């Protein structure tokens, strides 16, 4: 089995359905003896260019290990899901388990926002 990194972009109106979509794709991989090495929900982000007159979308990254039949089934699921605006599948040499640079940025932003809310709540 080979290792793949998959990034897909979901319509912003469908953001609340993203956890269910991730679970469905994870189940599809594991049901066919595949492995999930990393799942990252990058959240709603600004896109580099407009897609279907949208400036923002919900980003998700998966690192999986599966066979080509499973990969074809995943790709088919992406193509026929109207909520998925774009998807990219890249073959990698090994399993990636460490947080991606994008996820580290998301974590930094969340930490900064948390620090701001705690300093705003304290009296001067």
Swiss-Prot record:
GO molecular function: small ribosomal subunit rRNA binding; structural constituent of ribosome
HAMAP family for this protein: Ribosomal_bS6
Domain of life the protein comes from: Bacteria
Chain residue ranges for the region called Disordered: 96-124
Name of the protein this chain belongs to: Small ribosomal subunit protein bS6
GO cellular component: cytosolic small ribosomal subunit
Function text: Binds together with bS18 to 16S ribosomal RNA.
One GO-annotated biological process of the protein: translation
Gene, per the UniProt record: rpsF
UniProt keyword list: Ribonucleoprotein, Ribosomal protein, RNA-binding, rRNA-binding
Entry keyword Glycoprotein: no
A Pfam family reported for this protein in Swiss-Prot or TrEMBL: Ribosomal_S6
Compositionally biased spans, kind Polar residues: 115-124
Family statement drawn from the similarity comment of this UniProt entry: Belongs to the bacterial ribosomal protein bS6 family.
């Amino acid at each position: 089995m080979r290792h793949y990194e998959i990034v897909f972009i979901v319509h912003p109106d469908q953001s609340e359905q993203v956890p269910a979509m991730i679970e469905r794709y994870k189940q599809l991989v594991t049901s066919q003896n595949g492995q999930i090495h990393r799942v990252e929900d990058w959240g709603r982000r600004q896109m580099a260019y407009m897609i279907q007159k949208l400036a923002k979308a919900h980003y998700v990254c998966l690192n999986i290990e599966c066979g080509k039949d499973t990969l074809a089934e995943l790709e088919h699921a992406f193509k026929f899901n109207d909520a998925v605006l774009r998807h990219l599948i890249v073959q990698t040499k090994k399993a990636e388990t460490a947080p991606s640079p994008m996820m580290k940025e998301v974590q930094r932003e969340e930490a900064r926002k948390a620090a701001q809310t705690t300093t705003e709540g304290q009296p001067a």
